[in-house]
Amino acid sequence: MLILPIVKGEYKKDYNLKHLTWFKVGGNAEIFFKPLDSEDLKSFLIQNKQKLPIKTFGAGSNIIIRDGGIEGVVIKLGQNFSNIEFIDNHLIVGSSCLNYNLAKFCQANAISGFEFLVGIPGTIGGGVAMNAGAYGSEFKDIVVQIEAIDFAGNFLTFTNEEIGFKYRSNNLPKNLIILKVIFKINKGDSENILLRMNEINNARSSTQPIKERTGGSTFANPEGCKSWELIDKAGLRGYRIGGASMSELHCNFMINNGDATAKDLEDLGNFVQQKVCEDSGVKLEWEIKRIGRHP
């Protein structure tokens, strides 16, 4: 018998995650949990005596939920974890804050260095987890430290150096939930910041399928080259499996054309990975996470 910890937040059983993802595919979470606050989350983790499997969920922008759903508990940090505040010349930002919202906040307050976030879908916590970056900047350039909690309910802090940022990854422990991110502040000019953000938005709209059901870049760039160039060279621009295809506009983006399953998308990515390796001798590494059970 499944015994859930007593919490102040919200549980939902057999919860459909599809509508929370950008691809709009996937199965259900056995248990979906939105904690009220950090102490509520800590209480849940300490009480998790059955050691229910735990997955964390952000904005659903770079993830494929497999069609068989997710066993155990999916934890999503809601609006209570999205605050932005000034403390001692630093920004303290809740991990569920959207990258776009932080970029707009910084522009309004003449804080430079965050312009690139306007072009990165997802949350601040997810951005730290994968060292997200675009247009010449990455999270490693602006993060001072993070506050987090492990699955045993211990609050922890990690400095930029301790995080160990790498290209699209880091050295943080796996069983960790990021709660807050502390950023350094560099003052700038609001008008210049806005101009740069507009440049980024214009570049995205002209080169990426941002109006489609997509999950961002499918594969990380190998050292010294671009994934899209290798995919294009292998003749896979527009290639389709079921309801999923590689974008004609930017062939490192997968698209759900309306009737794709999670299996279609994952099969397409695996096929592209195989064909690029055969064509160029380079094995592309997934940037999009795939989690859950196969049906």
Curated annotation (Swiss-Prot):
Task performed by this protein: Cell wall formation.
Transmembrane intervals: none
Pathway: Cell wall biogenesis; peptidoglycan biosynthesis
Organism: Rickettsia rickettsii (strain Sheila Smith)
EC class name: oxidoreductase
Name of protein: UDP-N-acetylenolpyruvoylglucosamine reductase
Keyword Cell cycle: yes
HAMAP family hit by this protein: MurB
Listed EC numbers: 1.3.1.98
Cofactor(s), names only, from the UniProt record: FAD
Any single Gene Ontology cellular-component annotation: cytosol
Biological process, per Gene Ontology: cell division; cell wall organization; peptidoglycan biosynthetic process; regulation of cell shape
Main location: cytoplasm
Keyword field: Cell cycle, Cell division, Cell shape, Cell wall biogenesis/degradation, Cytoplasm, FAD, Flavoprotein, NADP, Oxidoreductase, Peptidoglycan synthesis
Family stated for the protein in its record: Belongs to the MurB family.
